[in-house]
Amino acid sequence: MSEDILIPKWVWILVSLAIVLGLGFWVSPLDRDGRPLLLSPDVKAVEDYRRSLVAWHAKLAELDGRIARVLSNDYGGDLFSQSSDGQKALNETLQVLNEIDQTAAIPAAVPARELALNVANTTLIAAQSALIWVSAPTPANLSSAQQALDAAHTTMSILEASQWDETK
């Protein structure tokens, strides 16, 4: 004798509802307080761009530290390593700058985009100045590179103070 197990419709509805709610909870982005965001297309575009800005900021901050290391005397006379690290920092800064420039910004994010481009540009100038100093280590070139790095720090602090950057 084979007895069929009958599952009522309300059980199927509850299980389906639990699965849909679980998926929604799992894939929904969270705001800074950990609450799920209700995403309309506009809100999603703003949130996506904000996350891009935070990622660019983190990468530029890392590159800033690497440029500062190139300007320090931590290499013990190893010109090849110092030059190589400076060149890598320059190339990666250029990649971030291109990524910022090529990412479409929603109208509300245009000022934040300009801030990010400014930070990337000043970081690129600092990387170039560091490489000039590595190639010709004169006090004037070191001073110029330090000034460029200070300018990058200043623009970075302006980006950090903006409402778009939640890393603060």
Predicted regions located by residue number:
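Mid-chain, structured segments of secreted extracytoplasmic proteins
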Residues: 1, 16-19, 94-99
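Ser/Thr/Pro/Gly-rich low-complexity linker/stalk segments immediately outside membranes or between
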Residues: 27-48
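Hydrophobic membrane-insertion alpha-helices, especially the h-region
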Residues: 9-28
